[in-house]
């Protein structure tokens, strides 16, 4: 059975994190041949995100978490989760369900077809600040320079 870890950067996700885990688990339980787990990365949240993470890790055996002492940014949280992962495959997803969990089904099908890497790409970044877009672009450029796996800008 192949293992997949979902790296989930979290900043002030107290209200929606349990819903994310529940909804994503509904999807992952339908995908045969894969064992899914979660790596939640608390990026210095100021709300109760850390407490929710600890409770989810107690409730679900497939939930692990990392917690930063302060906010370092989404890209740092993503990187920490990727470094911590030991799975066959890793998926980075947002906790706010902007990345539909049902896409995991198609991504696993693509992997079954023999691809080493699979990415979904957001087609628009409307409503995002220019500084946020700049940090996002920088993350992908740096990742592509230091990694053997090339990720297109906006890949999730």
What annotation goes with each model-predicted range?
Residues 1-26, 33:
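N-proximal low-complexity "stem/linker" segments adjacent to membrane-targeting elements
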Residues 42-51, 97-98:
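A conserved acidic beta->alpha catalytic loop
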Residues 62, 68-70, 74-84, 89, ...:
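Acceptor/aglycone-binding surface of glycosyltransferases and processive sugar-polymer synthases
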Residues 28-34, 57-62:
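Short helix-capping segments at alpha-helix termini
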Residues 8, 32-44, 66-67:
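Short beta-strand/loop segment that forms part of the nucleotide-sugar
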Residues 15-19, 47-56:
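Acidic helix N-cap motif at the loop->helix transition within catalytic regions
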